[in-house]
Amino acid sequence: MTNDQLAQSYLKMSNERMKALPLFYQNKAYAVVIREAQEIFELTLKGLLRFTGIDPPKWHDVGEIIKEYSNRFPDEISKEASRIIEISRWLRKERELSFYGDIDYVPTEIYREEDAKRAIEDATYIVQIVIKHFSNIK
């Protein structure tokens, strides 16, 4: 399997997961929206890295890798590197909390509609921009 094939696979999985976000949102499963959006964002960024010949690390927030190699991306993506890094950092921070919570942090009670909207917008943004430049997925 080549980097391009693996990257295409990542984007296909991201695109398929995007279809589930509205269902979770409609059911007010806002914590689930956050968690899924993070996984979509991460998978899409790792696809972006693979498309440019970079083997992505195994950790969840690859924002710093995006920053380091932004000169390898199309201008539209390079210009958005700061925004991409910020979103990646936010979603990574929410990753475990949205799934597991904590003693004083119950995910189903903490996350609100506006959090879910933001996560959906962020996931949509990254999937669209990467697919536009690198994928044969429509």
Language model features: what each stretch is:
Residues 1-138:
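Terminal alpha-helical segments
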